[in-house]
């Protein structure tokens, strides 16, 4: 009788334990489903596109960007889909032939219509930003600049995209957008999170400074460390992803690579004789004829303009780096500084801080000299040595050594190498701080430059506050999923064991 009673009690208890285990299993399953659904809400795929045309002084580039619509407030999600270089010079050269601008832009715009799905055409914004070449044209003739922009707008409006305007951006904007681009792509606007807890350990990351060198201007932009920006016109305030940034930026018009060369020629031709300029910034044996009207055809050379007894002059290269370097330094006025410290031409420059990303012509010139040196890392001292050796080579030997490089670019590499060294010296970079410069062509398959930052700003894709993140940090989410899964497995094994061998369970329990 006792045995029967005992057996009933055990069966009753086993049944209750199985019910409890079953209930626990249900709770674990519900928890797994709840965490999974909360963390991974199903979202329809929705890709957006944007087009930016960089109308520079020497050429125009078109960039197509794409990004997942549901993540457009996250940092680093925009990808460069395509880059198309428009065939021909910069748009400022079309001031007297604006009727040709439509054909000039056609090839790259047609490519855009092919690459972007037809269903997305009407919602794809198109922006054109013109830089220093058009700034110079506007200085010469505001009417001509307006006519060029009007012709550009007419052409771009004829395509099935959402044309948002063509404008001349300021040097300050160009510097700021370049700074935004490289830090966005490098993920420097996000906060670092701890994987140990549910609470984020917010830590503002160091941003990169930006060094941009174009054909007609150069920009330097960075966040100074504990330093007052003494010239208000060089100070910009940003609030990005919940963090405040005080940024120093300045654009030196006429100090882009091409215009700096024109300045140097205009300066040096004044002391030449007989219409021949022996130029240390070109390889020995190199010769070129230059029209005086072309030399003085830019506002950048007006300060050196004087009546010359000839209409043309001949450049004869002598290939002397030291003399070239000295001639370039004469373009930088260091005689007066109204601030605690300056770069050149009396422009305030706070103490350099942190790492810098150098792009555009900085990158292209350095990339060439890295190939010359057969080394991916070049110190300032090594760069000086390589440039000196390159300049001293005869023009014939240089052409033979680099047959794949266009002669126009090859002939100017001696000057370009010396100019970059001189310009960075003007920016107060030393042997040690040179090591903090990273020469960047692309970051994560996107070109380093101002265009992406320009689009991000105009489409409001960089929020002032940190966007809402998933309910749980990724590591915590994984941990909870594993915990509930293990609990579910443990409950299932225990329940199965009790169900199949109840007598063994109770014997062990007793």
Curated annotation (Swiss-Prot):
Nucleotide-binding among keywords: yes
Membrane topology: Multi-pass membrane protein
PTM per Swiss-Prot/TrEMBL: N-glycosylated. The N-terminus is blocked.
GO biological process: ADP catabolic process; G protein-coupled receptor signaling pathway; platelet activation; platelet aggregation; purine ribonucleoside diphosphate catabolic process
InterPro entries documented for this protein: GDA1_CD39_NTPase
Assigned EC number: 3.6.1.5
Transmembrane segments: 17-37, 479-499
Molecular-function GO terms, alphabetical: ADP phosphatase activity; apyrase activity; ATP binding; ATP hydrolysis activity; CDP phosphatase activity; CTPase activity; GDP phosphatase activity; GTPase activity
Keywords carried by this UniProt record: ATP-binding, Calcium, Disulfide bond, Glycoprotein, Hydrolase, Magnesium, Membrane, Nucleotide-binding, Transmembrane, Transmembrane helix
Subcellular location: Membrane; Membrane, Caveola
Parts of the chain on the Cytoplasmic side: 1-16, 500-510
Keyword Transferase belongs to the record: no
Residues carrying covalently attached carbohydrate according to the record: 73, 226, 291, 333, 428, 457
Domain of life: Eukaryota
Residues the record marks as active site: 174
Record's catalysed reaction(s): a ribonucleoside 5'-triphosphate + 2 H2O = a ribonucleoside 5'-phosphate + 2 phosphate + 2 H(+); a ribonucleoside 5'-triphosphate + H2O = a ribonucleoside 5'-diphosphate + phosphate + H(+); a ribonucleoside 5'-diphosphate + H2O = a ribonucleoside 5'-phosphate + phosphate + H(+); ATP + 2 H2O = AMP + 2 phosphate + 2 H(+)
Assigned protein family: Belongs to the GDA1/CD39 NTPase family.
Physiological role: Catalyzes the hydrolysis of both di- and triphosphate nucleotides (NDPs and NTPs) and hydrolyze NTPs to nucleotide monophosphates (NMPs) in two distinct successive phosphate-releasing steps, with NDPs as intermediates and participates in the regulation of extracellular levels of nucleotides. By hydrolyzing proinflammatory ATP and platelet-activating ADP to AMP, it blocks platelet aggregation and supports blood flow.
Database matches in PANTHER family: ADENOSINE/GUANOSINE DIPHOSPHATASE, ECTONUCLEOSIDE TRIPHOSPHATE DIPHOSPHOHYDROLASE 1
Protein name: Ectonucleoside triphosphate diphosphohydrolase 1
Lineage of the species this protein comes from: Eukaryota, Metazoa, Chordata, Craniata, Vertebrata
Underlying gene: Entpd1
């Amino acid at each position: 009788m006792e045995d029967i009673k005992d057996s009933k009690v055990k069966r009753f208890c086993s049944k209750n334990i199985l019910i409890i285990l079953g209930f626990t299993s249900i709770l674990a399953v519900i928890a797994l489903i709840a965490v999974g659904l909360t963390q991974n809400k199903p979202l329809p795929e929705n890709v957006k596109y944007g087009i930016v045309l960089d109308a520079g002084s020497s050429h125009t580039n078109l960039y197509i960007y794409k990004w997942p619509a549901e993540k457009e407030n996250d940092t680093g999600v925009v990808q460069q889909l395509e880059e198309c270089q428009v065939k021909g010079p910069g748009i400022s050269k079309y001031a007297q032939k604006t009727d040709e601008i439509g054909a000039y832009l056609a090839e790259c715009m047609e490519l855009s219509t092919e690459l972007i799905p037809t269903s997305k055409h009407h919602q794809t914004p198109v922006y054109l930003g013109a830089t220093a070449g058009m700034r110079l044209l506007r200085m010469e003739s505001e009417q001509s600049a307006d006519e060029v922009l009007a012709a550009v707008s007419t052409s771009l409006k004829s395509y099935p995209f959402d044309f948002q305007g063509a404008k001349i951006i300021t040097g300050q904007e160009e510097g700021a957008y370049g700074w935004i681009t490289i830090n966005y792509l490098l993920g420097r606007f996000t906060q670092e999170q701890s994987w140990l807890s549910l609470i984020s350990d917010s830590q503002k990351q160091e941003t990169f400074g930006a060094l941009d060198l174009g054909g007609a201007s150069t920009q330097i932009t960075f966040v100074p460390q504990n330093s007052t920006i003494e010239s208000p016109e060089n100070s910009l305030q940003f609030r990005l992803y919940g963090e405040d940034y005080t940024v120093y930026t300045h654009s030196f018009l006429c100090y882009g690579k091409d215009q700096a060369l024109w300045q140097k020629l205009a300066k040096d031709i004044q002391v030449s004789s007989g219409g021949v300029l022996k130029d240390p910034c070109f390889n020995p044996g190199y010769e070129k004829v230059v029209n005086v009207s072309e030399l003085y055809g830019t506002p950048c050379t007006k300060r050196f303009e004087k009546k010359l007894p000839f209409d043309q002059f001949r450049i004869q290269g002598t290939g002397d780096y030291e003399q070239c370097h000295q001639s370039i330094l004469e373009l930088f006025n260091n005689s007066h500084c109204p601030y605690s410290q300056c770069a050149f031409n009396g422009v305030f420059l706070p103490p350099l801080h942190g790492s810098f990303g150098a792009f555009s012509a900085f990158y292209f010139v350095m990339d060439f000299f890295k190939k010359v040196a057969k080394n991916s890392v070049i110190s300032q001292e090594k760069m000086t040595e390589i440039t000196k050796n390159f300049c001293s080579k005869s023009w014939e030997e240089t052409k033979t050594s680099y047959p794949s490089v266009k002669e126009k670019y090859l002939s100017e590499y001696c000057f370009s190498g010396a100019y970059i060294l001189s310009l960075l010296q003007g920016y107060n970079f030393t042997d040690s701080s040179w090591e903090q410069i990273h020469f960047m062509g692309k970051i994560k398959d996107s070109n380093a430059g101002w265009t992406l930052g320009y689009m991000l700003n105009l489409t409001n894709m960089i929020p002032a506050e940190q966007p809402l993140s998933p309910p749980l940090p990724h590591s915590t989410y994984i941990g909870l999923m594993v915990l509930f899964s293990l609990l579910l497995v443990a409950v299932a094994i225990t329940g199965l064991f009790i169900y199949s061998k109840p007598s063994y369970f109770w014997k062990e329990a007793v």
